[in-house]
Amino acid sequence: MKLLEYQAKQRFASAGIAVPDGRLARTPDEAAAAAEQLGRIAVKAQVPIGGRGKAGGIAVVDTPEDARREAARILSMDIRGYPVRSVWCETGLSIASELYLGITLDRDRRRFVIIFSTAGGMEIEQVAVDAPEKIAKLWPDPFAGPLAFEVRHLAFAGMAHAPALRDRAAKLAAELVTITTRLYTLAVQLDALTCEINPLVLTPEGQLVAADGKLEIDENAEYRHAELVAEVARDSAGDDGRTGDDPFEVEARKRGLTYVHLDGNIGVIGNGAGLTMNTLDLVKQHGGEPANFLDIGGGASAERVHNALEMVLLDPNVRGVFVNIFGGITRGDEVARGVIAARDDLGITKPLVVRMTGTMEEEGRRLLEEAGIVPATSAPEAAEKIVQLTGNSAP
């Protein structure tokens, strides 16, 4: 469950972390009223994804009339599938430096990792690629939490490649001890998967302020945070009343399908998580980009296959679909009937590549061939074929 920026900042403020003064607006008039109170403000779309600025979802305005106009524009937007239902209007900051401070769950080590960088305002994943020396990490003991000397060491390690901060490094490290401890406590209390401040702004006066925030709660712990879940639902960007859910994943849940939306253009359907993951890898190896992960599970009926194909093709970015089936309790003839029915019922004209092996494989292949769908004989062959048919090129 992903919180909106303003919801994350409210939690930061309650934990004692400084945030800019702001007001939530659901109408252009409310944004104008916020500008009357606060003066020069940033009007920021409240959607649970990044890239708002590039999409035109953030505007800095000087007057109430400008705030009204920009709020009207932003509230009419749909950013990567998320309709903008509210804007956060907050005072601007004078910036001396932009830092990054985040806490996320390291599943391999089974504990939180605290990440600090002087390259704030950028995607931390990109910083890790372009300038890994600017990132420092700390894995605190889960029982003791981050100790002061550990955070100071983290801070100095992160500032080692930032000569502009050298004169104020000691004071900054001391302040980071306080903020990091508070952020960590908040992450634990809220069962967070990610708790991030980016950028953490250092003002010319030396104050650290959370200029943007990201907070994602473990869905398995939602029962412990009923009030927060209810609050998030009120500002939901998803049709099922939950904020932060990808609209395609929302639809898949309604259909009872195990589906993860990705950024590519080749739809992928498999049976079993391992086989489906392997199918994604094969598509990537042959130069394609998967649009999704969809596992139909064992013993899937023709109806379930039909449902899965319909789900995958709801994504307008999908140029073709790769169906990869290993027949154990899943029968090849049932899969073939589902694929054929979906093609005919939905009028599918995009490329379909089907690879199946195992139970009722020969019957399934016969049905596909009679319907004009040529099945692939191996998974690598199928992956290569769908990549070619969808106009992708190998690296």
Annotate each PLM feature.
Residues 325-330:
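Glycine-rich, proline-tolerant flexible connector loops at the mouths of alpha/beta enzymes
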